[in-house]
């Protein structure tokens, strides 16, 4: 179930402050965050936000088509290495 429209999109306050401070600065730095639950706003476009995936910060460059999605969608938490291969020679 999605979020109610009357509430509006959610973004953590500390993340919004970092993005606004970055807008006033000439030099663009990577913004580190642990807030995977924050919605991407149009004001985030053009910034690189490093989203924590449980062991490291994954850099995510925000583009126009990402607006409205959550930051956590672009930093996968699980690594899938595939199933074990069947070694039929050892079974004989």
Swiss-Prot record:
It comes from Streptococcus thermophilus (strain ATCC BAA-491 / LMD-9). This is Small ribosomal subunit protein uS19. SUPFAM superfamilies: Ribosomal protein S19. Protein S19 forms a complex with S13 that binds strongly to the 16S ribosomal RNA. Gene3D superfamilies: 30s Ribosomal Protein S19, Chain A. GO terms for molecular function: rRNA binding; structural constituent of ribosome. Belongs to the universal ribosomal protein uS19 family. Keywords: Ribonucleoprotein, Ribosomal protein, RNA-binding, rRNA-binding. GO terms for cellular component: cytoplasm; small ribosomal subunit. PROSITE patterns: RIBOSOMAL_S19. One of its GO terms (biological process) is ribosomal small subunit assembly.
